């Protein structure tokens, strides 16, 4: 079931609790469809169309705020196991076939300010950043009740794409002016693009992808978030919030607990996917942050490879407090992992709805 814009925004901003939201954020990992076919899955189950969710009707404005005018990808080497290529940014990347969904950079284009100045033109504003008929298409989507989204590059993620994680972290201390210049350029372009967009259409949702943490914690601490990322985020979010945008949603895997306060101060008010294996317990997060932070995800994907009793226990722990407090679109915390039995996924969906319906009925939610 798709939920209209007004209902989704009322729910995710704590204005009105209603029957719970439920989604699949990322879908199956690369080999899982073959596993499920061998277990008798229908085509509709492979595409997840057979399963019941409740999530917003959404629309992404056709626009670009990040890297543009890249080179055409060039395949350097291809074997049965991997592909090595030069990507749009000029990076040499390696993709492991049958095991990965994203190519891993083997080298990066930026090491210092001189390198960055060669790349910087790809981040400057021009008219190509607006998709064809973007305004008319967005107005049509809004009239149909769709939730309107715009996106910016990550304050950690985009410099990481240019420099790599290790070099970026060193640069915060050894070349801070470089990181400031990168994010200042990105912010300037994002503001110019989104100023025009938000002046013409109602933007509801700002999305940013970071993926800046692992199981043991984030690669930036609160001080780095405050120094480098907050000024960038605030330039964009303050503009959009003044014009009626309501959700600023950050996507970051791993343990983000040490920097959540810093990111809330930077404007974030919604996070996903909330990975339990990394210590992101949505029950504890809700208890700590209350109505300051909406949540998406939070159900442990790994439990689906265990017993049905363990699946039920995970759902009984997570679902009741989220249904009671609202502003949480429940779902798995990442890709459905390889090795997940089809029967377990069917059970997970049915059991989740059983518990959500029970709790919603108990609370009298509509």
What are these regions (language model features)?
Residues 1-27, 32-37, 83-86, 95-96, ...:
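Active-site loop segments of alpha/beta catalytic cores
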Residues 32-73:
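Segments that shape or occlude catalytic/ligand-binding pockets
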Residues 55-56, 78-81:
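N-terminal catalytic or cofactor-binding beta/alpha core of small enzyme domains
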Residues 69, 79, 85-87:
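Beta-sandwich/jelly-roll carbohydrate-recognition scaffolds of carbohydrate-active enzymes
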Residues 72-77, 100:
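A structural signal for short, hydrophobic beta-strand segments that form beta-sheets
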Residues 93-108:
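Extended Gly/Ser/Thr-rich low-complexity repeat segments
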């Amino acid at each position: 079931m798709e939920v209209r814009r007004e209902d989704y925004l009322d729910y995710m901003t704590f204005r009105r609790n209603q029957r719970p939201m439920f989604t699949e954020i990322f879908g199956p990992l690369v080999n899982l469809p073959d596993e499920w076919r061998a277990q008798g899955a229908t085509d509709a189950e492979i595409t997840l169309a057979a399963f019941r969710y409740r999530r917003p009707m959404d629309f992404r404005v056709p626009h670009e705020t990040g890297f543009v005018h890249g080179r055409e990808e060039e395949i350097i080497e291809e074997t049965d196991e991997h592909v090595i290529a030069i990507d749009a940014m000029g990076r040499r990347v390696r993709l492991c076939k049958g095991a990965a969904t994203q190519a891993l950079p083997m080298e990066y284009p930026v090491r210092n300010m001189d390198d960055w100045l060669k790349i910087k033109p790809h981040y400057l504003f021009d008219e190509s950043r607006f998709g064809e008929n973007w305004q008319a298409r967005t107005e049509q989507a809004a009239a149909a009740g769709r939730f309107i989204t715009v996106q910016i590059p990550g304050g950690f993620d985009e410099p990481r794409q240019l420099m790599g994680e290790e070099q970026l972290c060193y640069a915060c201390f050894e070349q801070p002016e470089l990181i400031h210049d990168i994010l200042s350029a990105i912010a300037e372009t994002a503001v110019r693009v989104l100023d025009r967009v938000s002046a013409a259409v109602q933007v509801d949702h700002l999305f940013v992808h970071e993926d800046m943490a692992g199981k043991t914690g984030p690669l930036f601490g609160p001080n780095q978030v405050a120094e480098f990322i907050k000024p960038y985020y605030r330039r964009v979010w303050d503009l959009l919030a003044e014009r009626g945008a309501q959700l600023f949603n950050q996507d970051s895997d791993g343990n983000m607990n040490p920097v959540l306060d810093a990111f809330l101060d930077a404007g974030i008010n919604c996070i996903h996917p909330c990975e339990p294996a990394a210590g992101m317990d949505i029950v504890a997060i809700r208890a700590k942050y209350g109505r300051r932070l909406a949540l998406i995800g939070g159900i442990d994907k790994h439990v689906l490879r265990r017993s049905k009793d363990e699946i039920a226990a995970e759902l009984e722990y997570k679902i009741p407090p989220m249904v009671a407090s609202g502003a949480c679109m429940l779902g798995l915390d990442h890709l459905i992992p390889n090795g997940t039995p089809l029967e377990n996924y069917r059970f997970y969906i049915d059991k989740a709805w059983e518990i959500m319906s029970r709790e919603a009925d108990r609370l009298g939610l509509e």
